Amino acid sequence: DTLANNPLTVEVKGPGVATLNRYGVVVFFDVRPVEEMAFLAHLQPALSNPYPTPEIEELEVRIEPGNPESVKGDVAYIENAAVERLQVIADVLSKSALLSLYEKKVASEFDRIEPLAVELDRSGYLPGQSKELLKKIGSMLMVEQRMVGRAEITEKPDVLWDNPSLEGLYVRLEGEFEIKERHTAIERKLNLISSTVHTVLELVSSKHS
């Protein structure tokens, strides 16, 4: 049964709850592993370009009525398990999982690209063979393409518009998972990758003109 939309939040046999996020992340609450696997298997036909290895984020959620809501380490303390609260938690967890994927991908490409960027800055020439260089350009462009839509990571979830009282919980979760800081770090590396691609393409074009 559907409990809410944007993000889609549904009941899972158990009973439990799952949210299906626009980033392609599923967040489970109180769902047994066997039910998680069954739920994901049900979604499999609808998936396109799934990652070979899933990125997993975990957060313990404790319900403590009457106490201030807080986040301490890997534990979130909330007043109740209202769907809106679960959606806020799911939003941050999904962003964190997506950032983890981006961080790994960007880090591996950045390590390959940085020497090229340094050499370009130092001499203005393209090192290495042209075939290898074109492979690097293709790899860099693919990284940028996979990052499309990343700006949405810093946006607040829509659920806060109708539930402004939950903004404090969102801000605490966002800070605990360092969403803004991690996003900024990725942006810096992507900017270097982008400028390097632009410079390389200009140099390659001038060589063939």
Regions found by a protein language model. Give the residues of each.
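Intrinsically disordered, low-complexity, positively charged segments
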Residues: 1-5
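Extended alpha-helical interaction modules
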Residues: 7, 11-131
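Membrane-associated alpha-helical segments
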Residues: 117-209
